[in-house]
């Protein structure tokens, strides 16, 4: 149907009798959502709205990411590989969205930010319960982080629950054990509150998978999905650190951290270390060469 005079007529079937019925705004509770942006600067600094919306939308994406990662864990517990891969694929896209979102905040200049930074007080993204929840789901367990949420007993309890449960990676290791891979017994039951650290006893398991991809295609595909998730998460961390550096330089963070230096430390944290370590040894013959002093000792 052509458009006349740059106007588009309402089609006869479009609902206009919406009194008392479910509407778009009602379903999404937009009255509540769009009234949650309340600048504290007086008079309201123009750029504080950007700062608020950046972080509020990040929290919405984090809520979805946590939802998907919890589902991935349940699918692994049920040996539902394809369903797990589906939600991991969505998780990767959510992380990509979170990463690209930093480009909006990067338009905030140092002088603009300093125009309202004081009103933030001690509040900081470091206090994001959902971010910490996701780190715990992925395996970056750290009981010390519970101290930050002492002011919020309900939130602290939520964090403690995921801290004390197997992470996504630990459930993956248990899945591998159920399918005959030589996963050490300690991964069936251990202190789940401790962060997973690189374990050389797991390397042969992943070497076997990566050197026999046709035979272990399901396991291999899940490994690569997890690598994708960690890679995208690290890109998000990196983009966060660079955005902070761009906006405040090397000032201390509002939450009391060293700022950029503290964020740089996060880049050294890893979720699935063996999935990266195995890349060094895949296809490499680690046996001593013939004629070497060690050749006859094997």
From Swiss-Prot:
Binds 1 heme group per subunit. Keywords: Dioxygenase, Heme, Iron, Metal-binding, Oxidoreductase, Tryptophan catabolism. Weakly inhibited by D-tryptophan. Substrate binds at residues 51-55, 113, 117, 254. Heme binds at residue 240. It holds the Pfam family Trp_dioxygenase. Homotetramer. Heme-dependent dioxygenase that catalyzes the oxidative cleavage of the L-tryptophan (L-Trp) pyrrole ring and converts L-tryptophan to N-formyl-L-kynurenine. Catalyzes the oxidative cleavage of the indole moiety. HAMAP family: T23O. PANTHER family: TRYPTOPHAN 2,3-DIOXYGENASE (PTHR10138:SF0). This is Tryptophan 2,3-dioxygenase. It comes from Xanthomonas campestris pv. campestris (strain ATCC 33913 / DSM 3586 / NCPPB 528 / LMG 568 / P 25). The lineage of its organism: Bacteria, Pseudomonadati, Pseudomonadota, Gammaproteobacteria, Lysobacterales.
